Amino acid sequence: MGDKGTRVFKKASPNGKLTVYLGKRDFVDHIDLVDPVDGVVLVDPEYLKERRVYVTLTCAFRYGREDLDVLGLTFRKDLFVANVQSFPPAPEDKKPLTRLQERLIKKLGEHAYPFTFEIPPNLPCSVTLQPGPEDTGKACGVDYEVKAFCAENLEEKIHKRNSVRLVIRKVQYAPERPGPQPTAETTRQFLMSDKPLHLEASLDKEIYYHGEPISVNVHVTNNTNKTVKKIKISVRQYADICLFNTAQYKCPVAMEEADDTVAPSSTFCKVYTLTPFLANNREKRGLALDGKLKHEDTNLASSTLLREGANREILGIIVSYKVKVKLVVSRGGDVAVELPFTLMHPKPKEEPLHREVPENQTPVDTNLIELDTNDDDIVFEDFARQRLKGMKDDKEEEENGTGSPQLNNR
């Protein structure tokens, strides 16, 4: 808890009768476990009457146009669905309250009901495929939705106006230990040349953070009688779509075409620097992002970290990155190598559980810190993410969505 209090995100149903409170919008996948989704739902007792309060968590893979669902075609696959009866609490759903839930119930009163979900670690991270200008419907990709509503049973049809829907994100952060420094080399023998051309390339490290420049060291030994006319460096994003059949889509996210030449019987060495940015790739249809294009906190999708023995069929979209170094050789074709690397966000620093106490000040009793200190120090914030300027302000962003590239047409 910092000096500014504990931030809690809230969202109300369109009819104003239900409000969901969550401590965060992004939940971290630590490879072996995932942060639990814990929160409370506040319900108007006059609206609830004799009904029950349900909360569901759904992980869905959307891969086509929703408006075609009326034709009997399904363009969505639910990878995971969990239901909790928040009130009255079902015995199998009853779990110990988290610290956040205790504080929220104390602040909001007796009509605030807790819910907790455990996300299995083998589920995919949140990824959106960037839409094209002609695309309509929800964005294609993997998303997680928390939905709260009142009903007599789970099968009852619920109008959107009477429910709260929140799209949360499952994210991964860069591992603390990077892999080995990426290096690659190849040798090409040409006709009419006694000696070969040798290309060697390396990156300065294996893990890069979003927005960080990538240094590519290129070394060419040209013992042939041919000339290297150009050197092309590109950073490519690969998205493996794992659903029924695995398909791979690749998209360049940073490129440099240098007019550097390497004459026959000579050597060449140079470091090239490229920085992949979403801002330079906003028009590319099918590019994998970690959020929606209209949100400020969206960037290129992070590399996917896989558990050993993970079932690829339910991993949705697996994202990876490679640097490609290509030599254009006169009358000899191209010579190329690829360097895989990891692109992610660094793991944020964890906030201390307790405030620092100056040496000349008597520390507060431990029990008071745990039970009473700052119980009212909660800052409520709307769940909706900050939009980029000029982006259309949807009234119900989870309902209307952005356009989606359709995988069946690609």
Swiss-Prot record:
GO terms, biological process: G protein-coupled receptor internalization; negative regulation of Notch signaling pathway; positive regulation of ERK1 and ERK2 cascade; positive regulation of protein phosphorylation; positive regulation of receptor internalization; protein transport; signal transduction; ubiquitin-dependent protein catabolic process
Regions of compositional bias (Polar residues) in chain numbering: 401-410
Matches recorded under SUPFAM superfamilies: E set domains
InterPro entries membership: Arrestin (IPR000698), Arrestin-like_C (IPR014752), Arrestin-like_N (IPR011021), Arrestin_C-like (IPR011022), Arrestin_CS (IPR017864), Arrestin_N (IPR014753), Ig_E-set (IPR014756)
Phosphoserine modifications at: S404
Molecular function per GO: G protein-coupled receptor binding
Post-translational modification remark: Constitutively phosphorylated at in the cytoplasm. At the plasma membrane, is rapidly dephosphorylated, a process that is required for clathrin binding and ADRB2 endocytosis but not for ADRB2 binding and desensitization. Once internalized, is rephosphorylated.
Residues annotated to bind 1D-myo-inositol hexakisphosphate: K250, M255, K324, K326
Region of interest (Interaction with SRC), residue spans: 1-163
Subcellular location: Cytoplasm; Nucleus; Cell membrane; Membrane, Clathrin-coated pit
Residue segments, region Interaction with CHRM2: 45-86
Broad class of the protein's primary localization: cytoplasm
Keyword Nucleotidyltransferase: no
Annotated spans, Interaction with TRAF6: 318-410
Region described as Disordered: spans on this chain: 389-410
Database matches in Pfam families: Arrestin_C, Arrestin_N
GO cellular component: clathrin-coated pit; cytoplasmic vesicle; cytosol; nucleus; plasma membrane; pseudopodium
Function: Functions in regulating agonist-mediated G-protein coupled receptor (GPCR) signaling by mediating both receptor desensitization and resensitization processes. During homologous desensitization, beta-arrestins bind to the GPRK-phosphorylated receptor and sterically preclude its coupling to the cognate G-protein; the binding appears to require additional receptor determinants exposed only in the active receptor conformation.
Protein name (database record): Beta-arrestin-1
Organism this protein belongs to: Macaca fascicularis
Gene (name only): ARRB1
